[in-house]
Every structure is written in structure tokens, then in C-alpha cells.
């Protein structure tokens, strides 16, 4: 369950947005970046983006998270309305410390899936129930989900969110993230 706390204007290089802050029952803040009026609308472009300190903030090239975030904001900002739900779920939900430990294991030759399993952690521990709550908070009729992740599609549909379209995010791989993206496609079913 989420609770709305505050909002403010957020002018950005990607357009005019408002930022909403919600807290969940784990007392984590989740940011929702909204462009235009999404209340009660259909076919709202929505990106559910999980926090990635190394990629989003530090510009790590081990993943494509920052590029996905930027491309999503550009797309949403170019539409009449849309939203990005920024979930505080670092490292596919395992937290920053375990993510850095996974990086170390990847440096030793494991892939991203094997690195989590080696630590006794799930491959992906993210939860999308708060995203469902946010979409319902805005009374959105249907969404166009900006994602490559089939698990997000499945979860949202199973929890009553009508998805009219999947919008893929195609980011050309680099020599640094090519193996990571290949693992996401082959072992996690991501749709590129």
C-alpha cells in the first residue's frame, strides 16, 4: 500500500513534469514523474524504472539502466501525457551491497543470474505492487508499458492493469554491457 506525501513542479531537459512522492509500507520513498494530466486517461505511456545508483547516477556502463531511463523520459516528455514510476529497488531488489558483491562475482566470470544465485539471492526480487497502487491512485484506465521485461507485463496484467501496448526500449549494446544484456535476453526472457 502506498500513501501520497507531496508533489512539486519538475522542469527538466526532457519536458515539463511534476514529481510526486509516495511512501510504501516499508517506509521507502518512491518518486513518480508525471507529464501532462494522466488522471482517468487511457493508453498512458508508463515506465516502471527500478533504482540503479551505479547506472542512473554514476553512469556505469555495466548496464543500460541510465540509457533506458533517459530514453523513457524523452519519450514520455514528447507525448501529451505519461509517467515514470521510479521504484526504490536497487539491484533488481537485492540492495546496493549485494549488487556490488554481484559485480565482483561478475568480474570473476559469472553472469548476472549466476552472481545472484551464488549469493543465495533470487535472480529478481523486485515487487511491482506499489506501481499497481500508483496507477490506480491516478485512476488510469489503461497503459502503454515501456519495458523489455515480460515479468512486469505479466505482474501488472495479473493485478488488474490493462496494458494496450508494450513499447520496447532498444539501446545498442556496448562492449561493457553486451554480456549482461545477452544474459537478460537468454536467461530472463527480456524482449529486445
UniProtKB/Swiss-Prot annotation:
It catalyses: GTP + 4 H2O = 2,5-diamino-6-hydroxy-4-(5-phosphoribosylamino)-pyrimidine + formate + 2 phosphate + 3 H(+). Its cofactor is Zn(2+). One of its GO terms (biological process) is riboflavin biosynthetic process. GTP binds at residues 47-51, 68, 90-92, 112, 147, 152. Zn(2+) binds at residues 52, 63, 65. One of its GO terms (cellular component) is cytosol. The active site is at residues 124, 126. It comes from the Archaea. Belongs to the GTP cyclohydrolase II family. This is GTP cyclohydrolase-2. It comes from Picrophilus torridus (strain ATCC 700027 / DSM 9790 / JCM 10055 / NBRC 100828 / KAW 2/3). The gene is ribA.
